[in-house]
């Protein structure tokens, strides 16, 4: 479980394929604090550390993870949002984030407004995911508040600190991002769509 508060940016150092798996080597400032089998959020994807060497560590993504996330768009040199799993007793400064990406979204607009930035993203609403204004959304692992919610689009406002300390400053129109919708909202939507009989209520 994560909070969506990004700790640092990592850099993709190497990408190798092993049958249908993908091994990704990341350089980061928190590598010395990691251990084998530790869970780390990479752009919102929960991946397990399998190897550590100096300032680099390696994680492995299986075929399903690659298909459901923006991993296919990663390149050597890319900046990746990193967050280690939260501990019981930590402050929950963002919101509950599982590290399970629901779908890929696309950045369709970026505007600068009074020193901050507004990013608009498009997503596939037919998959059953929804956003609500003032609700929580995770974009590339970053906990954000929806400021404008449409049927297939939503917008978020990014303050300068978040812009500089996450990979939002690398986004352009067309950038593919990982989206994780609010877990509480997903359960409510699922329950609401079920046909309950009176005996089950």
Description of each model-found segment:
Residues 1-201:
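Conserved loop->alpha-helix
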